[in-house]
């Protein structure tokens, strides 16, 4: 029975890709080479003539995110550091799915090659990344209540964690105090379009040049929220690597990335409360993971560390502490509870 259903699905997708190809003969030609790519969990993907990628959203639950990616492409038509969008459809009139046709890019993810680069090459790559981010961030969005957004993400997760008895009484006091600082640190006026999933698996490298991929998580948010994933990857590069590339990740290779970002995109790190804001983002991110895996002590420690940064009595700025290693050293000196401002 399962085999029969599977065969029906294969036949259906074969008919759909043939219809898409037929509708786009001016792009593909009359007898194109079609190869199915076995990647992606929510999309079915085909390589056409080794020049184009047809991405079909076969999961209705992912349609909102898929449309985000199409909108992202349409907002960045002149950005040569992302693939080109040739065609897209969300009307389901002729094809019963959302789909897009984009440029196939050559190369490998940065995770595959970062460890082989000299420091000069790494600086050039981050310069290109900064150029790509600047172009993306030139799309200005309307202001909304960012503090409330983060509070509404954090609090239900925190309640779950308390119900699971993850934190002791002293840790809860720390988290409560850090939460009280959200209003102070999260006020934002600089809302732009961001990629929102920037790590090295989503940056492709070929012959000295990079291109960004995977825009389904894109959103309008404060500019520094672009650093949420990126800064976390810099600190723990193995967390975002595939099984194949994890063996190449050495945190020492990532030490200077924030310094290069400051050099080539100073506006991205200009918020005086950057460390506190990134720490709040960490609290939300790791708390979401922790309530799913309450047995993992490392996730709990990550939440607590973020709360300690937010709760520091002597506030730190990016000018004081620029690299993850410097932040760890600073926190090791200021780790006692005397650093919490109880006034």
Language-model segments: what does each one mean?
Residues 34-145:
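ATP-binding pocket architecture of kinase catalytic cores
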């Amino acid at each position: 029975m399962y085999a029969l259903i599977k065969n029906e699905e294969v036949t259906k997708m074969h008919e759909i890709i043939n219809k898409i190809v037929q509708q786009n003969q001016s792009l593909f030609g009359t007898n194109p080479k079609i190869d199915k790519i076995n990647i992606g969990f929510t999309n079915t993907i085909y390589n056409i003539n080794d020049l184009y990628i047809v991405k079909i959203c076969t999961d209705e639950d992912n349609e909102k995110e898929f449309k985000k990616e199409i909108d992202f492409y349409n907002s960045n038509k002149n950005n040569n550091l992302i693939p080109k969008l040739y065609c897209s459809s969300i009307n389901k009139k002729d094809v019963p799915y959302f789909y897009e046709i984009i440029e196939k890019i050559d190369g490998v993810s940065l995770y595959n090659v970062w460890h082989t680069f000299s420091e000069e090459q790494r600086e050039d790559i981050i310069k290109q990344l900064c150029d790509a981010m600047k172009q993306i961030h030139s799309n200005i969005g309307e202001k909304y209540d960012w503090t409330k957004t983060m509070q509404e993400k954090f609090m239900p997760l925190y309640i779950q964690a308390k119900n699971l008895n993850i934190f002791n009484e002293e840790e809860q006091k720390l988290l409560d105090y850090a939460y009280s600082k959200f209003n102070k640190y999260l006020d934002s006026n600089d809302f732009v379009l961001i990629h929102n999933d920037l790590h090295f698996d989503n940056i492709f490298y070929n012959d000295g040049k990079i291109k960004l991929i995977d825009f389904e998580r894109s959103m309008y948010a404060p500019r520094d929220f672009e650093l949420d994933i990126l800064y976390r990857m810099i600190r723990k590069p193995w967390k975002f690597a595939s099984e194949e590339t994890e063996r190449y990740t050495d945190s020492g290779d990532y030490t200077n990335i924030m310094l290069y970002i400051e050099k080539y995109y100073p506006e991205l790190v200009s918020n005086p409360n950057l460390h506190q804001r990134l720490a709040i983002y960490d609290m939300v991110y790791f708390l979401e993971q922790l309530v799913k895996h309450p047995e993992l002590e490392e996730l709990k420690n990550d939440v607590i560390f973020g709360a300690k940064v937010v709760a520091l009595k002597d506030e730190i700025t990016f000018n004081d502490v620029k690299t993850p290693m410097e932040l760890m050293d600073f926190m090791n000196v200021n780790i006692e509870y005397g650093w919490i401002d109880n006034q």
